[in-house]
Amino acid sequence: MAKVKCAIIGSGNIGSDLMMKLLDNEVLEVTALIGIDAESEGLKRAEKHGVKAISNGIDGLVENPDLADIVYEATSAKAHLHNSKILKDLGKKAIDLTPAAVGPFLVPSVNLKEEEVPHLDNVNMVTCGGQATIPIVKAVSDVLKVDYAEIVASISSMSAGPGTRQNIDEFTVTTANAIREVGGAEKSKAIITLNPADPPILMRNTIHIQTSGSAEAKKGEILEALDAMVENVQSYVPGYRYKAEPVVKDDIVTVSVEVEGNGDFLPKYAGNLDIITAAAVKTGEMMAKNLLEKERV
């Protein structure tokens, strides 16, 4: 079966996990892992798996533009602000896993629509917390107007690499923005905590939602919408599940979800990284299928 070539910028934890997820993909062929340190473990790992390792950053892609049609950005928000312009000039589709938010926010279970895929050139995967919590907010906002949504994402310190730590301010701003734009909340707040517990905890997310009008009066509809959304997310993130049963009282809905990683490269406790890479793969697959259909026409 024909495949669409893709490259990954960023040879750290997220880039490495993406590469492992893509090695046996049915529609995507990972052709290059791009970093800035020839001695990095990520680039050495790429070579072992037969993936071209590029150590001079995005310049390596500029020198070899035919390497990929789709490019995953797994570096930092600052880096993508620079790289996005180059990718646009090269005519590459970009899937951004940083909080840069150059392109529109995308959460596969909420707003990845087949008919819109042809028009997507640069999409932003929000943040790990956004991928885990926005579907919950959206499920409730589809039933009742959401006046306010507050999310607390708690992740293991051991799963937070340099990129995550450098982007914490951007994480809170980008996640809160996307809760409004994609989740449908009027107002929002996002908080992230790093938990140093050993053994490491799974990613846990608590979502507090205040509705306009009585949520309790529509409890059945809300619970049904939540169950359907969780099942949707599980179609590409199998380890996504309720941590506790949702609570609906008066105008408040409280939902707790946890994410166990798939263990492709990262440990299973790193569900925070796994959910965003899985969402990015799902998005790339949709883009690739669209490109392959165009070729057949």
At which residue positions do the language-model features occur?
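Generic macromolecular interface patches on structured domains
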Residues: 81, 146, 189, 289-290, ...
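Active-site-lining helix/loop region of Rossmann-like oxidoreductase modules
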Residues: 9, 131-249, 263, 267-270, ...
